[in-house]
Amino acid sequence: MTVVTRFAPSPTGMLHIGGARTALFNYLFAKRHGGKFLLRVEDTDKARSTDEATQAILDGMSWLTLNADEEPVFQSKNAARHVECAEQMIANGKAFKCYATPEELQARREAGEAKRAQGKQEGLSEADRNGLLAEANELLAPYRSPWRDGGDPPVPDAPFTVRLRAPDDEEIAVSDHVQGDVTLKTREIDDLILLRADGTPTYMLAVVVDDHDMGVTHVIRGDDHFRNTFRQLPIFAAMGWDIPEFAHVPMIHGSDGAKLSKRHGALSTLAYRDMGYLPEAMNSYLVRLGWSHGDQEVFTLGEAAAVFDLAGINKAPGRLDLEKLGDVNAHFMRNTDAARLMALLEPEIEKLTTLDVGLTERLQHALPTLKERGQTLPELAESCRFLWDSNAENLNKKARKALREDGIKRLSELREALDGADSWTIEALQGVLDAYCAAHTLSMGQVGPPLRAALTGGLPAPDLAPVMYWLGRDEVLARIEKHLPATGR
């Protein structure tokens, strides 16, 4: 058997991280077993589905490199096939035409709610209370249509829906890879609508038909769909189709255990891209958010695909931890090759300054060191600010203190020593600093602060010798000179 999984988003909004994790689990399971990973866009809700959301889903999948093995299936294009299957079930006695109107069904619900409210009133005898609540329960029970065993329409050409005839008094058993073995009495499900009164197929019918026609062997989805499984299995049975295996994955919660919301970080996948996270970091973080494999915390996509299994999915909801995501992203930034990291960083730098040839060269020299200094691309870009900004007009308190009297005197002497440096390498520049300290019986703790203040204005930066090498001789001398006139103030 070839394993076939599918990710089936509805294009009514962006691809959020919960959906991205579901897609990832489906992708990894298929790759682990040498199978196929498919994408189905469930766009049957024409009122809410948009082309923009569809494109955002496709873009999010592409960014995460979760590429489907076949072209996407658009559910709306299969409507004729869905109707055909409903008609086949009518012919086989598994489905029927129901002439109950929406108004009648609404009246039934309202009557049931009214009986329930009456049954909760004070002053009733136990017999009256029980009678009212029994009537309420009957009216509010899953709907069994009076036309389920046949019958003529109330009037000629009366509108109708097509409903699946729910099994009478049986148990539906689901053996779920995550939720375990669960059974449900069929009296707890209604005669499910397959075709609406306008002839369009419902979600429940479309999902089952498409899963069968696409050859899906494993349905891996959020546990908010778990109860739907008990309504979908009778459709498989009515059509005489093989039933796929199921794995219903718990939802992602916020760090406080509450339902995930925007304040927790419930953003679209592309929003995380725009915030400076790498796709490999998102994949690594999401795969560990509700799945475990030994003590390994960080995975490449290939590493995860080699070991991913359904048994490792936790039954409890995962909790979104943005600090942990930042740590994972920092790991992947540190391990990204210089050329790719430079390409990713350039747009962030351009948001802050003009990226000319000189700055590009400085960045290329500095990145192997500076890439340790941020958790996201914008943070990394900000840590590079000293490469183009001396911050001379916005010195912090520590920098201003370092540039008083003795500091300015040492800065003037250092400028002369640096101007006379035979070569401009990190080693040579460190030698100049060491020689100056030795000649004046000073420590680097006394010499470094004024020089750092002049070069970076208090902006965070690494060791001075590399900083001077990256800036270049002319820029270093110019930044020092900018502060030397202060001696006369």
Which positions does each model-derived feature cover?
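Non-transmembrane alpha-helical segments in soluble domains
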Residues: 58, 86-90, 283-286, 305, ...
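Residue-level signal for inorganic ion chemistry
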Residues: 26, 57, 89, 93, ...
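Active-site cores that bind ATP or allylic diphosphates and position pyrophosphate for catalysis
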Residues: 97, 101-248, 253-260, 268, ...
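Long, amphipathic alpha-helical coiled-coil segments characteristic
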Residues: 399-429
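Helix-rich, typically C-terminal accessory recognition domains appended to large enzymatic cores
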Residues: 425-471, 475
